[in-house]
């Protein structure tokens, strides 16, 4: 899946300094068709997934083939990722949002991932620079996002909250960038703010996303807390009145399907399995 995005950028057909959202509409891979860019979102995705491949393979050979563009993308995130401008993230149905704390979290994880790749490729200077950068950004993120017993939806929006599921990669990839207290505080807040059929994405709506919530649940320290966050999703899947292939965007109050069905994002519900798999790989 990553090959096509790499080729699109490396060939010069994609001119922007961040990763493309797509390469076309099936069956034609003749250029991005999505109308709104997701600069930090997609650039972060490419770096994080390349890091995951390296850890799964036990080497960074794949990353080495694309090092020039990975470096360019990492520098881009270093410049704009701490406090993203008004742009879309993967929840594009919720619209644009500036200073998005969860999007910033993705940038931090991606920069840390690049640091890990550099370490695996015996590039100590780059490894030290980007790993330390990610750690500084994490501390700054905590300062800007702190809202008492949780962290904000956006840095400039006190009294708000959102799932920070992008931080799951610190645990899954073994990056060790975040202070432990960040995930602990977030998960404790999630457990107190669930609805009958799951945890809303943020305070603006009562919508839920199956894949995102499993990522958030995977951040939990204990199996009990993980199960507590998963149980309402199981209830949604079993009790939804919408008899369709699994809908990943749904209403947490009544289990009604909102939109999206049988999509590839359902693969995200296997995050806990990926966590176990990569944890064993790192031993």
Enumerate the language-model features and the residues they cover.
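Aromatic-rich carbohydrate-recognition surfaces in CAZymes
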Residues: 1-82, 100-114, 118
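Beta-strand segments within the central parallel beta-sheet cores of soluble alpha/beta enzyme folds
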Residues: 2, 64-71, 126-136, 185-188
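Extended ligand-binding clefts on enzyme/binding-domain cores
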Residues: 6-31, 35-41, 100-108, 135-231, ...
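A sequence-level detector of short, solvent-exposed, charge-rich linear segments
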Residues: 20, 89, 96, 126, ...
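Alpha-helix capping and helix-loop boundary segments enriched in small/acidic/polar residues
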Residues: 33-41, 57-68, 84-105, 121-129, ...
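Well-ordered alpha-helical scaffold segments within catalytic/enzyme domains
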Residues: 45-61, 106-124, 165-179, 212-225, ...
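C-terminal ends of transmembrane alpha-helices
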Residues: 79-87, 143-146
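Terminal, non-catalytic domain-edge segments
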Residues: 232, 247, 252-283
